[in-house]
Amino acid sequence: IIGPNGGGKTTLVKTILGLLKPIKGKIQFYREGQSTPSLRIGYLPQYTTFDRKFPISVRDVILSGLHGKHFVWHRFGTSDQQKADDIIHLLELDNCAHNAIGEISGGQRQRALIGRALVCDPEILILDEPNTYIDKKNQDKLYELLKQVNTHCAILLVSHDIGTVLRNVRNIVCVNHNVHYHPVSEVDEKLIEDSFGCPFQLVAHGQIPHRILENHTD
């Protein structure tokens, strides 16, 4: 999902999550082609605020993603603990799993929050600007991880990084008060201009597309 600030990306995501009610129309979920009232959803918000001094470990943050299926004071069983450990290993957080969440780097913290979204075995994973706090090297590793996850889980990803998005996704939703939905192969400068409301060029270095804004008055 791409589009300018204020275009409706966050509103769309919150409506899918059930945090907002649509003014008209409805959100419909499907499982294996059959309509279903809901699906398991994992969610990484764009901004996550917390008390850095709060004594909770990386492992416990990831386990907290299971509270949606248990009571808040539920004691996690062996299978839950193993699931968290598998996510920790998958995200390469083994060396800081027992560190306090406020003591680790921004990139590690972002991966821990992604782990919290993954641990519930979501059928849909919604990530709002997941590259936040993650350097370029680890961004590439993140997208490789998401490709693995995508074999058994649908992913909705909100991003301003058009170049990275075009390299790693199959379909684009352009949101700017209207919605344009296309396979990546059909995305061109005209579509992006209509979505962002200003002219720009797509320039490719090999297989890597970039965007360059042209002169405009806004």
PLM ranges: what are they?
Residues L63, T78-C96:
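Conserved ABC ATPase "signature" region
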Residues G25-I41:
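Conserved ABC transporter NBD signature motif
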Residues E186-D218:
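ABC ATPase nucleotide-binding domains
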Residues R170-S185:
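H-loop (His-switch) and adjacent beta-strand-loop-beta switch element
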Residues A100-I104, Q108:
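Conserved ABC ATPase signature
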